[in-house]
């Protein structure tokens, strides 16, 4: 989508890189536009999910009773870490049979999706231009974003899945009647007439709590990855300011390399940390669904 008339080249560059490959061929006009399908987010998220499945399958196939290799040892270390966290948070052993593998999958999946942000900003656009697939507006890959977790739909979709699991385990453990009763009687417990007076307030607080957990879980991941992606674009603009072998261009070029390297190293921590936080909160929220107020 072209930038508004009179916009600077820098603004046009950023606006172009923030538009998804979708079914309408341009940027969404509003945040919630349910007729829009972002093909790039679907492709890269599914591809990273399949890669997680393949890596876990490969580790299971190569598993031996003897001294594990580096790859097997690395996977076993991650599995043990996630399993330990699941045991300490979700006390129901039967629930952990599903929740622990889910947490492991979510953790690795988000790591791989986040790691796509470490690819050079203009790597794929350059490839699309050279192949003629994205040289100008109207080409099939003129718009293409590689980072699924910087698309609000992906983190919010995952957080919605966690919310549904909270409802599922809440109803399963407490039974439908107990779950509904808790919505109206907690966190302010009372008896008699007072319980009837407090029931609407309890329901409202519980609904707000569920909504806040779901929204904050998705927005935290989205916000951090979107900001990281935007910073990489701003750093890339330093390199794009090259005008020849002069003092200003050389200084900007050095700044581009240094800033890009420092931010990439720091961003590795963000990639891992955001995946860990999402996994831990998934376990915490599902664990809380097993407990009463």
Swiss-Prot record:
Membrane topology label: Multi-pass membrane protein
GO cellular component: plasma membrane; proton-transporting ATP synthase complex
SUPFAM superfamilies for the chain: F1F0 ATP synthase subunit A (SSF81336)
Keyword Membrane attached: yes
Pfam families: ATP-synt_A
GO MF: proton-transporting ATP synthase activity, rotational mechanism
Keyword field: ATP synthesis, Cell inner membrane, Cell membrane, CF(0), Hydrogen ion transport, Ion transport, Membrane, Transmembrane, Transmembrane helix, Transport
Similarity annotation: Belongs to the ATPase A chain family.
NCBIfam families linked: ATP_synt_6_or_A, PRK05815.1-1
Protein name: ATP synthase subunit a
Species in which this protein is naturally found: Bordetella pertussis (strain Tohama I / ATCC BAA-589 / NCTC 13251)
Gene expressing this chain: atpB
């Amino acid at each position: 989508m072209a930038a508004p008339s009179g916009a600077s080249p820098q603004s046009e560059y950023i606006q172009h890189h923030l538009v998804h490959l979708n079914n309408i061929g341009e940027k969404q006009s509003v945040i919630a536009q349910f007729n829009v399908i972002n093909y790039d987010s679907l492709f890269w998220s599914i591809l990273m999910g399949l890669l997680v499945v393949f890596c876990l399958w490969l580790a299971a196939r190569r598993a031996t009773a003897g001294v594990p290799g580096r790859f097997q040892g690395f996977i076993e270390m991650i599995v043990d870490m996630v399993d330990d966290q699941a045991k300490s948070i979700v006390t129901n052993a039967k629930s952990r049979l599903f929740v622990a593998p889910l947490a492991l999958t979510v953790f690795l999946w988000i790591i791989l999706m986040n790691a796509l942000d470490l690819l050079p900003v203009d790597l794929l656009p350059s490839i699309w231009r050279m192949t003629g697939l994205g040289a100008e507006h109207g080409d099939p890959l003129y718009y293409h974003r590689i980072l699924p977790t910087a698309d609000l739909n992906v983190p919010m979709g995952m957080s919605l899945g966690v919310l549904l699991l909270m409802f599922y385990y809440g109803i399963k453990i407490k039974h439908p009647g107990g779950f509904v009763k808790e919505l109206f009687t907690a966190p302010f417990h009372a008896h008699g007439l007072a319980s009837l007076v407090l029931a609407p307030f309890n329901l409202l607080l519980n609904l707000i709590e569920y909504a806040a957990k779901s929204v904050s879980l998705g927005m935290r991941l989205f916000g951090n990855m979107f900001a990281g992606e935007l910073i990489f674009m701003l750093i890339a603009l330093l390199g794009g300011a090259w005008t020849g072998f002069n003092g200003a261009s050389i200084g900007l070029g050095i700044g581009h390399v240094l800033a890009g390297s420092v931010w990439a190293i720091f961003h590795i921590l963000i990639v891992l940390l955001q995946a860990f936080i999402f996994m831990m909160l998934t376990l915490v929220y599902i664990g809380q669904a097993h407990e009463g107020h």
